Curated annotation (Swiss-Prot):
Keywords (A to Z) from UniProt: Membrane, Transmembrane, Transmembrane helix
Protein name: Small integral membrane protein 12-B
Gene Ontology cellular-component terms listed: membrane
Family the UniProt entry places it in: Belongs to the SMIM12 family.
Stretches that traverse the bilayer: 12-34
Organism: Xenopus laevis (African clawed frog)
Topology of this chain in the membrane: Single-pass membrane protein
Amino acid sequence: MWPVLWAAARTYAPYITFPVAFVVGAVGYQLEWFIRGTPGHPVEEQSILEKREERTLQETMGKDVTQVISLKEKLEFTPKAVLNRNRQEKS
């Protein structure tokens, strides 16, 4: 009799274990939320975007925004492109 029961349990195991696992998981999930309770989210005074704007304003307050590097000076410090390594330099 035991071999017949083991064969039946082996054959129908997916049909038995999935609903059991689903019920155990659902009960555990609900029990965990019941014990833990709903989390209280802290209310932020400013959004991240507002904080970023404030930080950039504070950084630019001490700088003179009219003094900028010219493009010619800026291009001298840029590295040469990888694709132009094997080309001959123009004289």
